[in-house]
């Protein structure tokens, strides 16, 4: 990683006029890891490799569009004045929640059409998305975005961060809270917990790994978002905090309701819809 005046160079490779940014490289790395993990788990749950690959091919472009559209909508005053910036995602400005919503819609439609349990497929995907998000936040780090309020060098040193991380948090003449790191760490912790218990007999019904992911991520995101300085707002309210509250209580409420109202298949049973149709 080259340095620009003590700051990490956001460009990984320059090929003539083509610049390959670390932001894209890091996000792509997270996606690749997520795909590998999802394929491994899908085999155990009687979901075909082709189904996973097809889902990814459909979901990724819509997730990218959804993530960008979400951001543009809530920053419309800027993009209305600068329409050429709308497609320049390498400048940053994609919202995770928008991407997750779009990808989930694609997953549900595909599963209904191909006799797959949407709950099961989303269970398989959820922890892999979580680790991809954790990795992707380091793309924000390279772009010096998604940071928090002003802090001191002394505070950052108490976190025992490498010097290159601390130096990157010097933005516009002031040290900033590394909120990208807080969210990344929260996601890694959630990933480890879910991966450690998801194969235990009787722990999860289908759909509950997904709901665990939603509740875990939304809970952490609510507090991290409160520290950020680049939040999207509706009036005085932070959009992501509102959505985090809705998702957290919605996920917990749906978990309780499903347990009370339905006889649910166990996660370890895998996909039974396709065999039932045959």
Curated annotation (Swiss-Prot):
Its EC number is 2.5.1.145. It is a multi-pass membrane protein. Keywords: Cell membrane, Membrane, Transferase, Transmembrane, Transmembrane helix. Pathway: Protein modification; lipoprotein biosynthesis (diacylglyceryl transfer). The chain crosses the membrane at residues 18-38, 55-75, 89-109, 207-227, 237-257. PROSITE patterns: LGT (PS01311). Its main location: membrane. GO terms for cellular component: plasma membrane. It is found in: Cell membrane. GO terms for molecular function: phosphatidylglycerol-prolipoprotein diacylglyceryl transferase activity. PANTHER family: PHOSPHATIDYLGLYCEROL--PROLIPOPROTEIN DIACYLGLYCERYL TRANSFERASE, PROLIPOPROTEIN DIACYLGLYCERYL TRANSFERASE. Belongs to the Lgt family. This is Phosphatidylglycerol--prolipoprotein diacylglyceryl transferase. The lineage of its organism: Bacteria, Bacillati, Bacillota, Bacilli, Lactobacillales.
């Amino acid at each position: 990683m080259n340095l620009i005046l003590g700051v990490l160079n956001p460009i990984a490779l320059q090929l003539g006029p083509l610049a390959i940014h670390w932001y894209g490289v890091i996000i792509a790395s997270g996606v690749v890891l997520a795909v590998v993990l999802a394929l491994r788990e899908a085999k155990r749950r009687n979901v075909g490799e082709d189904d996973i690959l097809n889902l990814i091919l459909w979901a990724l472009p819509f997730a990218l569009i959804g993530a960008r559209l979400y951001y543009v909508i809530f920053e419309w005053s800027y993009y209305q004045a600068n329409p050429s910036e709308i497609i320049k995602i390498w400048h940053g400005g994609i919202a995770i929640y928008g991407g997750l919503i779009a990808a989930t819609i694609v997953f549900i439609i595909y599963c209904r059409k191909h006799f797959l349990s949407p709950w099961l497929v989303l269970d398989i995907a959820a922890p892999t998305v979580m680790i991809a998000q954790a990795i992707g936040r380091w793309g924000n780090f390279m772009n010096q975005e998604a940071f928090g309020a002003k802090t001191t060098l002394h505070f950052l040193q108490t976190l025992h961060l490498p010097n290159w991380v601390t130096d990157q948090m010097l933005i516009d003449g002031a040290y900033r809270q590394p909120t990208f790191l807080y969210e990344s760490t929260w996601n890694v912790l959630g990933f480890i917990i879910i991966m450690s218990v998801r194969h235990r007999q009787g722990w999860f019904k289908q759909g509950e790994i997904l709901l665990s992911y939603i509740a875990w991520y939304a809970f952490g995101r609510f507090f991290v978002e409160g520290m950020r300085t680049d939040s999207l707002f509706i009036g005085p309210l932070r959009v992501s905090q509102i959505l985090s509250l809705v998702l957290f209580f919605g996920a917990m409420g749906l978990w309780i309701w499903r347990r009370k109202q339905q006889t649910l298949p166990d996660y370890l049973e895998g996909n039974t819809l396709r065999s039932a149709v045959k």
